[in-house]
């Protein structure tokens, strides 16, 4: 479940300046980290004794090594992050249940120092519903769209020219339920994503077993129900995260029954037509107690799909048929840790970084660009309760 209730109210953001260490990379004794071919890696976490907010590391694309993570911005449970198209601003949900005395989570805005990785807090706005779990910045960089798991709702928060957040411009409350009396008594919007044309928003609602489809207007910051307004998945599946393929396909990972459903996406009308549903576990293996899926992403090449399995503690790899959109199982690769809630694929498509929430580690896996298979690199860093990985191209001063 995404929503971890906090009774604390976030009223201020304390930002810790980041001095990225001029240390040798893990596993690369005596070898300095490159400053010309590296990415800033931002790590969203659940805060507590081991974590205080958003952390930053650097990934050297040549050596595969990560620097020791440093606190970049102190804020409450930034469990999902989104980067502005300019790469100059970062936005984080605060997965809390009370903001400024109301039943709401919040969204925090930061300015990125592209050289040091330091985050400067800009401002916060309410997510309108409690327990936000996911957010995305629209392709024009004018709005943040947020999904509230605890409240079962979605909202739009406009972005000003200076990167600050304006008061929410749209809010839609989902309604209904599904078959699981523990998890699906009401709506639980778990993610929201936009199509490449910035015209349609897709909200996966675990509580309803639906992917709701909205027409999105970036100029107005508005959401309007599409026709048809949703795609249905199997009862009790629990749709969680959603990934869009450039060829007109889309994929939702279903948390509760550990499957991925592939859709054909009508790029003009926004509608979704189911193509296939396939298990995220090895062939013949069933769902065990404590197992659930989490994240799903398309490889930058469009050739492969990756999904994370918690409990099984693996990344599943599928090959994508470029003509039909159907998936073929390739492998499950252990994440060398416990509970891989989130992961990130670097923009070059060379590495997958798995965030193991319960073992407090981020592990670097190499991607074979021909087969999609994953290989451990031996590089791991420690950070408290990591759950989200985002990349920003580093810029030398």
PLM region spans:
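Beta-rich, blade/repeat-based domains predominating
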Residues: 36, 50, 75-86, 128-139, ...
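Blade-loop segments of beta-propeller domains
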Residues: 67-141
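A short beta-strand motif characteristic of beta-propeller blades
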Residues: 67-73, 120-125, 176-182, 226-232, ...
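Loop/turn-rich, solvent-exposed surfaces of beta-rich toroidal or solenoidal domains
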Residues: 291-357
């Amino acid at each position: 479940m995404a929503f971890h209730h906090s009774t604390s109210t976030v009223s201020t953001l304390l930002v810790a300046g980041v001095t990225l260490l001029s240390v040798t990379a893990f596993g690369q004794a005596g070898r300095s980290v490159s400053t010309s071919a590296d990415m800033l890696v931002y790590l969203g976490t659940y805060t507590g004794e081991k974590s205080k907010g958003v952390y930053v590391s650097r990934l050297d694309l040549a050596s595969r090594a990560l620097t020791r993570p440093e606190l970049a911005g102190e804020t409450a449970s930034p469990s999902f992050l989104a980067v502005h198209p300019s790469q100059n601003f970062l936005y984080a949900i605060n997965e809390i249940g009370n903001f400024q005395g109301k039943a709401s989570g919040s969204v925090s805005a930061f300015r990125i120092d592209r050289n040091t990785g330091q985050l400067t807090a800009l401002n916060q706005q309410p997510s309108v519903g409690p327990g936000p779990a996911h957010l995305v910045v629209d392709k024009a960089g004018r709005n943040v769209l947020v999904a509230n798991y605890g409240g079962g709702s979605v909202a739009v928060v406009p972005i000003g020219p200076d990167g600050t957040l304006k008061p929410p411009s749209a809010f839609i409350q989902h309604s209904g339920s599904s078959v699981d009396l523990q998890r699906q008594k009401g709506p639980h919007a778990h993610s929201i994503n936009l199509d490449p044309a910035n015209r349609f928003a897709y909200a996966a609602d675990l509580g309803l077993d639906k992917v709701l489809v909205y027409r999105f207007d970036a100029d107005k910051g508005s959401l309007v129900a599409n026709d048809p307004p949703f795609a249905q998945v199997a009862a009790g599946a629990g749709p969680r995260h959603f990934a869009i393929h450039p060829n007109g396909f889309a994929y939702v990972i279903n948390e509760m029954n550990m499957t991925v459903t592939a859709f054909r996406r009508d790029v003009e009308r926004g509608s979704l037509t189911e193509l296939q549903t396939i298990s995220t576990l090895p062939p013949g293996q069933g769902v065990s107690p404590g197992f659930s899926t989490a994240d799903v992403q398309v490889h930058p090449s469009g050739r492969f799909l990756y999904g994370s399995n918690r409990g099984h503690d693996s990344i599943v790899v599928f090959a994508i048929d470029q003509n039909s959109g159907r998936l073929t199982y390739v492998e499950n690769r252990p994440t060398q840790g416990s509970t891989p809630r989130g992961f990130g694929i670097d923009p070059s498509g060379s590495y997958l970084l798995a965030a193991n929430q319960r073992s407090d580690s981020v592990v670097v896996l190499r991607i074979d660009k021909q087969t999609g298979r994953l290989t451990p690199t031996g590089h791991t860093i420690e950070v408290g309760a990591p759950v989200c990985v985002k990349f920003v191209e580093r810029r030398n001063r």
